[in-house]
Amino acid sequence: MLKINKYSLIKNAAVLGVASLSLSLIATSSSFSDGHIYGENNPVTVKGYKGSKTDSTAYTGQMARQLQHNSLKKIVSKGKPSDPTSNTLNKMLNYFENKDKTKSMAILDPKSSSKFPVKQKMVGEISTGSNLAGKADGRVQLSWPNNMTGADVIRFMIKKASKISGGVDMRNGMNYPQLISKYTMGAVLYHQACDNYLDEKMTASNKPNDKPYKKGAYYTGKEHSWDEAFGYWGAAAHTMTLSAQQSYDVAKKKDLKAADFNKDGVVDLYKEMTYGHAYYASAFDRGGKTDYLKTVTKAFIDGRKIITAADGEKLTSSDLTKVHEP
């Protein structure tokens, strides 16, 4: 029996003097333990669906935001405020504010190389409708002055970073690539996963499983909510087949063999890459004292199987208890 006690547990770790969030989830399971790939065997269960889709798994928007986060961090570290032609601020804001509707927003990290070729070159190849700003915590951050929201705080730091070469303010001890990255991981990625999709959207009345997520969708409300939370976690779909070291090396673009699960010679940045919180979990787990990466990923796989097994019907109270602690 799968038991997931709470998805909103956080482990705080200091990374370069900045708080780094690592999602920790407590789960034990004996049933639904045969699958090792996220998204495996998830048929379309929406009643009355007449389209051509056969797989209900979808978290493209979340992977696009993982790439925007990676790219934003990269461009912050390359800022040249002394060069008036560099347009540093607008480039940074582009990766935070905008959606890649025209498939012209270049993926800056990971970039393709001979040792680690990647399938996609533009963010819009995965999703044309995603940005970071629109998903940032909109509540006032009491720890910051002037009633700034989460999105406001990130913009504030971006503006500061645009005025500093390489994004590091040595005089005031501010490493903006790290500050912006870690704050974005919390205010966007973690916030959306744990305070939205695994919280409100796992209650009975919110995005019910007997209805499509939205009109015409090929996935149910609960199926897609769960998938979106998994996307914000940032693990490759085949993470359960990897060691923590391999998952870490995939994030560092050092292990093509481990990343290329389908053996087509390139890394699919939608399903085969390690990002964000899953990357930090991999880093911690390499020492052998923790098992965050597989604990969380396995619980996501098992929870999705419970939702899929409902076959497009409402989740029972027992199902809801398993996937969400009231």
What do these predicted ranges mean?
Residues 1-10:
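N-terminal secretory signal peptides that target proteins for export/translocation
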Residues 10-15, 215:
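Generic structural signal for short, flexible, solvent-exposed coil/loop and linker residues
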Residues 13-24:
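Bacterial N-terminal signal peptides
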Residues 23-33:
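Bacterial Sec-dependent signal peptides at the C-terminal "C-region" and cleavage site
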Residues 31-326:
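Mature extracytoplasmic or organellar-lumen-exposed domains after removal of signal/transit peptides
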